[in-house]
């Protein structure tokens, strides 16, 4: 595998071009970003894995350099797109680390295609459906403000703590693909909202780590033990004080936890 990031393309079953990127050395690690985000979601932490893993990222359909069809999206489709990338690379089995909506997509991959996943990390995510814990009405109202700048500030504060924001003014790579068309943004929102993997979770046979920030109210922290209890043999690790973007702000804690898990510790 290449050690320098570059963008190439795989073709999904419906002909949609899916952009993907490679970097690092070693066994493959598929990194899946959050809703309405492209591969830059991982910019702040990708180098942490470079010495021991070949990282594979992708731009979801509707984001980045990938095609942006107007047909419905779903986490099932995102999972199939990710597998198209692995197929293009000739990768039969990979470690998979999904955060937020990427964690929902990772659940589908691991549940429906267990032979493709060595180790699974589910970060700041939810099983969805009737069993998942939803964000509060207050959080929804803060994100739905007509004042777009106010809504963006609200999202930033859900992702990061005030202490972090005081020292890191941005721009932040976890705030959504700025060039994403409106139709794709709506389709991503619907795909995430309609996700329901509850019945699939017991079929996950990969060794699994569930990671979450204790102070995450964007995707409520109560979802983490729910996932860990539903997936056979899953481990649970809660990062004290972290909000949604625990993997970036609390990189010094989260990175070693993930690396130790990948190493079999």
Give the role of each language-model region.
Residues 107, 111-112, 118-146:
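Flexible "cap/lid" loop of the alpha/beta hydrolase fold
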Residues 131, 150-200:
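Conserved alpha/beta-hydrolase catalytic His-Asp/Glu region
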Residues 204, 210-212:
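Short beta-strand/loop motif that positions the catalytic acidic residue
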Residues 215-219:
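Acidic catalytic loop of the alpha/beta-hydrolase fold
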Residues 225-245:
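Catalytic histidine neighborhood in serine/cysteine hydrolases
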Residues 242-255:
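Catalytic histidine-centered segment of alpha/beta-hydrolase-like enzymes
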């Amino acid at each position: 595998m290449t050690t320098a990031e570059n963008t190439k393309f795989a073709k999904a079953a419906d002909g949609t071009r899916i952009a993907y990127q490679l970097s690092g050395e070693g066994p493959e690690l598929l990194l899946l970003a959050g809703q309405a985000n492209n591969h830059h979601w991982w910019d702040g932490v990708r180098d942490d894995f470079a010495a021991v893993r070949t990282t594979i990222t992708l731009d979801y359909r509707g984001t980045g350099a990938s095609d942006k069809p107007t047909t419905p999206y779903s986490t099932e489709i995102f999972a199939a797109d990710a597998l198209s990338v692995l197929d293009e690379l000739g990768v039969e089995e990979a470690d998979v680390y999904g955060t937020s909506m990427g964690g929902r997509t990772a659940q589908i991959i691991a549940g429906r295609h267990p032979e493709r996943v060595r180790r699974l990390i589910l970060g700041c995510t939810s099983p969805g459906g009737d069993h998942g814990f939803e964000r509060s009405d207050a959080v929804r109202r803060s994100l739905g403000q007509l004042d777009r700048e106010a809504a963006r500030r609200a999202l930033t504060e859900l992702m990061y703590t005030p202490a972090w924001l005081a020292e890191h003014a941005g721009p932040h790579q976890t705030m959504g693909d700025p060039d994403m068309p409106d139709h794709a943004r709506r389709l991503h929102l619907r795909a995430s909202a309609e996700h329901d993997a509850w019945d699939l979770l017991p079929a996950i046979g990969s060794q699994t780590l569930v990671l979450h920030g204790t102070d995450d109210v964007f995707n409520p922290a109560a979802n983490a033990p729910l996932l860990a209890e539903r997936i056979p043999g899953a481990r649970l690790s809660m990062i004290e004080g972290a909000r949604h973007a625990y993997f970036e702000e609390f990189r010094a804690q989260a990175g070693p936890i993930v690396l130790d898990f990948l190493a079999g510790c």
